[in-house]
C-alpha cells in the first residue's frame, strides 16, 4: 500500500515504529500533489517545498528524542483557507484577501502543530465559506476526484478533495451549515462537525459566528476521532469556547452498538431525496440494526423551516462579519477611487464575488429596521424551536440517522445556475448547526454513476462518542475506497 493511501493514524504508527520517516511521508504527499493537483485543484496555496521538508526533519528529530509521541506526529495535513496561518497566505478563496498574510495562527491549527502534524498547504473553498460546491472561489474550481466533471461539494470542497485524492493524509474544514459533512459525502471521505464550542474559533475567519465550527476530514472514523482529540480545547480567546468535561473521543472506537437507540426522521425521506441515496441510507440503517441497534422511524418537526431560518441568521451574521473587509487596514484595495466612501464601494464591489454579495445584501436587508422583527427575530425563535425538537428526539434516541445530502455530487456549473436549488441541498445538514449539535458523514456506497453517497449520524450536544461509536461499527462492514485518480506509482509504503 502506498503512503498516501494509508490512514493518518496508521502512518503515525509506522513513523513511530521507524518503518517510514517523516521526510518520506511528506515527499510521498508532495509527489502525489504534483501528479494530481493539476486535475483536482484542491489547494489555493502550497507551502514552500524546502520549508516543509525542513519542518519534517525538525519533527523527526523531536520524535526520535521522545519529545513527540502523539498519534499524528509527522503526519501531513492540509488546512482550509479560512483558518489563519502566520506568514502564510490566508485568502478565504476571495480576491479581497488575495494578499493577506496573518500575524498569528488559528488555535485549532496551533493544536495540530503541537501534535506534530506537518502542514502542507491551504485548501480551496467557496468564497468566505458561502456555497456548497467550491465553485464560488476566486481561484478556480476544485474538481471531484471521483469524476472531474463533478463538484466536490462545499464549502470545504478543497479539504475533502485533497483527502480523497491522497494530497494529504487528513485535513481541517469548517462547518456552518454542512460544509464538512456534505463535501465529505460527495468525495467519499469521513467528516465530523463537533458540538458548537468544542473547537476554538480563534483565528477562523468568521462567516456565521453562532454556527461556525472547525472539524476534521479524513479517510476513516478512527482518524476523525483522533484528530478531534488533538484540536478540541477550551480557549479563553474564543468567547463561545466551552470547557468540556470530556475531551476523550477515541475510547468510543468500539464495534458495539447493541442496545443503541437510533432514530430515523421520516421527514428526511420525503420528496427531493434521490432514490439511490435513500436505498443506501436505509441499507446502512439495516446493517446497524443487524449489529444489535434498535432502529425506528419518528417524526422530527420543523425540518422544513431550517433552511429559511438558517439563511436569515447566517446572512445577517455575515453582513456584520464581512463589514471589516473595506480596504483600509489589510486585504485588497481598489485603485482610482475618489474619496473614502468611493474607496469602500469600489473595494467591496471588486473584491467580493457574486454569491458573497448576494448574502451580504440579504443579511443587511433582514437586519434593517423595518424587517428586523419580521425576519431576524423570527429566525432566532425558529432556531430555538428546532433545538427543542432535537432535545425531544434525544430524550428517546442516542443517535439520529439520515442522508448527508439529498443527492450525489452534481456536475460543475449545474448548481451556480440555480442558487435556490443549491440552498435546498443543505436541507439535512443545516438544522444540526442551528441546534449546535455534532454530526458526522461516513461513506455508505456509490450510485450508478460511481459517485459516493454519505450517511449522516447526528448526536446530542457533547455526545460525539455516540456518533463515533455508531459510525465505527458501521465502518467495520466496509472497506475505504479511494478514487482511481488518487493512485500513483510513487510513494510505496514499506
Question: Where would I find each of the regions flagged by the language model?
Answer:
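Residue-level signal for inorganic ion chemistry
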Residues: 29, 52, 105, 224, ...
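Short helix-loop capping/hinge segments that flank enzyme active sites or metal/cofactor-binding pockets
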Residues: 72-92, 254-263, 316-387, 438-454
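An N-terminal boundary/leader segment
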Residues: 1-55, 65, 290-292, 365, ...
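Short glycine/serine-rich loop/turn segments
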Residues: 72-214, 265-267, 316, 402-420
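Structural helix-boundary/capping segments
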Residues: 35, 114, 165-170, 174-272, ...
